[in-house]
Amino acid sequence: MREAIQLAHSALYITSPNPRVACLIVRDGRVVGKGCTQAAGQDHAEVQAIKDAKARMPAAALRGATFYVTLEPCSHYGRTPPCVDAVIACQPAQVVIAMRDPNPLVAGRSITKMQQAGIEVRSGILAEEALALNPGFISRMVTKRPWLRSKIACSMDAKVALADGESKWITAAAARADGQHWRARSCVVLTGIGTVLADDPLLNVRAVETPRQPIRAVIDRRFIIDEKAALFNGDPVWLFVEDRALTAAEQQKEARLVQEKNARLIKIPLSDRHGASEALDLRAVMAYLADNEINEVHLEAGPRLNAAFLEANLMDEVLMYMAPKIIGPGREAFALSPLQRLSEARQMVFFEQQLVGTDIRLSARDAQRWQAMLAAISE
């Protein structure tokens, strides 16, 4: 199973909105077929592995084999036929599954179907490692929203910029290059209008070989983005704006952006948190993304938007690149209100630490949410 999980990593950038899945077929102690899920609408991992095995040996030789799959095979018709039927047709003796699929269209049905066909099924093998491959897909199935990961580059004293806003560059080139991988695996790279106006970023994937670019999205309540912004380079851009009637000038601006810049304007209601309606409802933003089959959201934003997602309890993971620098007075990663008691602090759990060049990459996540997803795939 560990080998199958490693194989699934080769599909890290291409499967969305489907999960990243790999399958190994083992016969007489050796791997005779392998495959991983391709782009949406193409073969899933099980079908790829079966085709690979049949290219090496007679189809009848698959009878009695063992299938190792990182996710329960699908049991429904979508862009492709059900994989469980292809597996059953091979008449394996055993199917070993890393995790159950919480998708309501599957949800254990494939396991039951294989057992009814006389196949021994084992599940829950390296489930947490398999979950780490697909936090976005599992989150969308279990919590009805994508997995949101905030990427932060900071100094040892947790400053993301000088007091005047200068931030290029706190971290070194190796850390910045490593960050491209996390953009590439995401479905959406999200930022706020403040970052766009201050830095004019591209927010695209560079220095990583990938067949697709994630959608770039901007929280822009007042719809003040410059039509000449660098991120309008032909690839899709989604703009989340306040749900209100646009002025005539704004309507013309929207038409130009849609027709000439491949942009989409998405109207979102204002938040009513704490009785104030000054910002977009970020839960509505996340619901829209989930409805559009977005699995992983990569947030690269300033202190205020970081704080807004954290306070809305929507930040699932923090990816922090810490440079061995001490800045002193400067801008914090989160523009949070002061706490009255330490017990009010938002608690996350570190799960990975990695030296990247001269900097350190720290990864922390919401442990409660992670455990809820782990429980859903282990039932």
For each of these PLM feature ranges, what is it?
Residues 311-348:
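Flexible, gly/pro- and Lys/Arg-enriched active-site loops
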Residues 1-16, 140:
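Short, basic/aromatic recognition patches
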Residues 21-29, 152-153, 362:
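Short beta-strand scaffold segments in enzyme catalytic cores
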